[in-house]
UniProtKB/Swiss-Prot annotation:
Keywords, in A-Z order: Acetylation, Activator, Chromatin regulator, Isopeptide bond, Nucleus, Repeat, Repressor, Transcription, Transcription regulation, Ubl conjugation, Ubl conjugation pathway, WD repeat
Originating organism: Mus musculus
Localization, UniProt: Nucleus
Gene: Tbl1xr1
Protein name as catalogued: F-box-like/WD repeat-containing protein TBL1XR1
Chain positions found as N6-acetyllysine: 102
Modified residues (N-acetylserine): 2
């Protein structure tokens, strides 16, 4: 590669001319002796300087975002840089560290945060917050007041009611109970998923099956060394699907055997769900696409390339219709066989972290880094409710298994939201109001889960605590402090055990029976 000063000067001269700086161009041309150069200006295309600068900028962006082997750095998409950012010293190292910090926040894997939370105890008491919205159209709910609630008695779960499962060698990001038996699946940064057998029929205590996520290299299976980011059981409890940062989804039997490997994503998989019928699996990836897979053949039925940035979450509305959300701030509702979204919801002003259909499939809830929770209906383009009460990013949401179309039809439907502001909020969506604000946590809350009867809500935070709340009163009824920040909480089908996965590699099972 060679660059002469005459060539640089000519491109600058042409840029000044094309930009209307005629006097500056004349002066610069005289001082740099442009007329004496042997460059044929007729062969140089317009905007040549801008074009070559853009290519250089793209090269710096690639340096920041792509490893030497061509893979995305930390599985992140190429970030757009400004020209000034690109010429700053150490831009590659600075931006890569920023990526690591962002990833640490999203996955709550920052050891520093865990250490900071070690000696913190919840001193704030539980509160109740209600706010009134407008009667017609979209409801905008603001935080009006908080009344602190008393905690009833000693709520600490004794150690003999908590089983700590160890085996993972890195953070355990996710866990999920088998819907028909006491098998708990967990997924970790150690590139494994595990199936823990917690049935009381086992004479030797809990046992584990290790599901090693491998890729083919040189004709051999080698560990992928990538995080297991998502997992989901089918409704019959016979198969477990996992998604990984290596870009592959996998289907396993409950005995731990690999049944299928699903490979069409071009980057990490962030979310993965079975449909109720159990014939399709839906996945969302950093490659901006979502894919419906045939669970029987392992083949992709349809890929949906509608997002303009990484897809973060998906949820089925029916057996062939689903919603997806993205860092592009959009929500698409898509149907198998349709080549365009059947509905697009826009209104969030930052990344949309999670979406969930209510039990009837009529209302879709979404939460975002813009600190809002929105409720959408297929019957209209604008949101039905715009719920504003959290003062930091909302990480996840869950609907209660109550109301019409559920096994608990006489109980009111509720929505829970978990935020980086360390609070959990319970919402009455029909009225568009916050009915309880749960304020015991001291660090970001990453997971919430309703018990099967909807009477209790479990929450897990990076303060290492799992709290169990009464959904009717908002009272804290059980509390457990683990040894690592909590990423995920989940209830078993019987509603008497809560599983929790943690940043220190542990998986906890809390027995809530008397």
């Amino acid at each position: 590669m060679s660059i002469s000063s005459d060539e640089v000067n000519f491109l600058v001269y042409r840029y000044l001319q094309e930009s209307g700086f005629s006097h500056s161009a004349f002066t610069f041309g005289i001082e740099s002796h442009i007329s004496q150069s042997n460059i044929n200006g007729a062969l140089v295309p317009p905007a040549a300087l801008i074009s070559i600068i853009q290519k250089g900028l793209q090269y710096v962006e690639a340096e920041v975002s792509i490893n030497e082997d061509g893979t995305l750095f930390d599985g992140r998409p190429i970030e757009s840089l400004s020209l000034i950012d690109a010429v700053m010293p150490d831009v590659v190292q600075t931006r890569q560290q920023a990526y690591r910090d962002k990833l640490a926040q999203q996955h709550a894997a920052a050891a520093a945060a865990a250490a900071a939370a070690t000696n913190q105890q919840g001193s704030a008491k539980n509160g109740e917050n209600t706010a009134n919205g407008e009667e017609n159209g979209a409801h905008t709910i603001a935080n009006n007041h908080t009344d602190m609630m008393e905690v009833d008695g000693d709520v600490e779960i004794p150690s003999n009611k908590a089983v700590v499962l160890r085996g993972h060698e890195s953070e355990v990001f996710i866990c999920a109970w088998n819907p028909v038996s006491d098998l708990l699946a967990s997924g970790s940064g150690d590139s494994t998923a595990r199936i823990w057998n917690l049935s009381e029929n086992s004479t030797s205590g809990p046992t584990q099956l290790v599901l090693r996520h491998c890729i083919r290299e040189g004709g051999q299976d080698v560990p992928s060394n990538k995080d297991v980011t998502s997992l989901d059981w089918n409704s019959e409890g016979t198969l477990l699907a996992t998604g990984s940062y290596d870009g592959f989804a996998r289907i396993w039997t409950k005995d731990g055997n690999l049944a299928s490997t699903l490979g069409q994503h071009k980057g990490p998989i962030f979310a993965l769900k079975w449909n109720k019928k159990g014939n399709f699996i839906l996945s969302a990836g950093v490659d901006k696409t979502t894919i419906i897979w045939d669970a029987h053949t392992g083949e992709a039925k349809q890929q949906f390339p509608f997002h303009s940035a990484p897809a973060l979450d998906v949820d089925w509305q029916s057996n062939n219709t689903f919603a997806s959300c993205s860092t592009d701030m959009c929500i698409h509702v898509c149907k198998l066989g349709q080549d365009r979204p059947i509905k697009t919801f826009q209104g969030h002003t930052n990344e949309v972290n999670a979406i969930k259909w209510d039990p009837t499939g009529n209302l879709l809830a979404s939460c975002s880094d813009d600190m809002t929770l929105k409720i959408w209906s297929m019957k209209q383009d604008n949101c039905v409710h715009d719920l504003q009460a959290h003062n930091k990013e909302i990480y996840t949401i869950k609907w209660s298994p109550t109301g019409p179309g559920t096994n608990n039809p006489n109980a009111n439907l509720m929505l829970a939201s978990a935020s980086f502001d360390s609070t959990v909020r319970l919402w009455d969506v029909d009225r568009g109001i916050c009915i309880h604000t749960l304020t015991k946590h001291q660090e970001p809350v990453y997971s919430v889960a309703f018990s099967p009867d909807g009477r209790y809500l479990a929450s897990g935070s990076f303060d290492k605590c799992v709290h169990i709340w009464n959904t009717q009163t908002g009272a804290l009824v059980h509390s457990y402090r683990g040894t690592g920040g909590i990423f995920e909480v989940c209830w078993n089908a019987a509603g008497d055990k809560v599983g929790a996965s943690a940043s220190d590699g542990s998986v906890c099972v809390l027995d809530l029976r008397k």
